[in-house]
């Protein structure tokens, strides 16, 4: 029971983080090339990956794995 709750929390965090990043960028509060934007996208995608694979929903799991990789590359480029 506790494991399922924790996984659901990861999933909801992921949803809120990705939607927040998109909304903040769309309303010009943050730019897409900022660290906070990429962190929200990357950590949000990780949360969705966790809940997706737990529920055996592989399409969103694969999509968000790719999303995580893109965010990680963008973050690395900021520091190179």
Roles of regions detected by a PLM:
Residues 72-80:
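Juxtamembrane boundary at the C-terminal end of a transmembrane helix
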Residues 59-73:
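Juxtamembrane/interfacial segments around transmembrane helices
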Residues 27-32, 54-58, 80:
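Membrane-interface helix caps and helix-loop-helix hairpins in membrane proteins
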Residues 1-21, 29:
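Alpha-helical transmembrane segments and their cytosolic membrane-interface
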Residues 10, 17, 24, 40-43, ...:
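Hydrophobic residues within membrane-embedded alpha-helical segments of Major Facilitator Superfamily
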Residues 47-63:
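Membrane-helix boundary connector in multi-pass membrane proteins
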Residues 29-42:
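Structural signature of hydrophobic alpha-helical transmembrane segments
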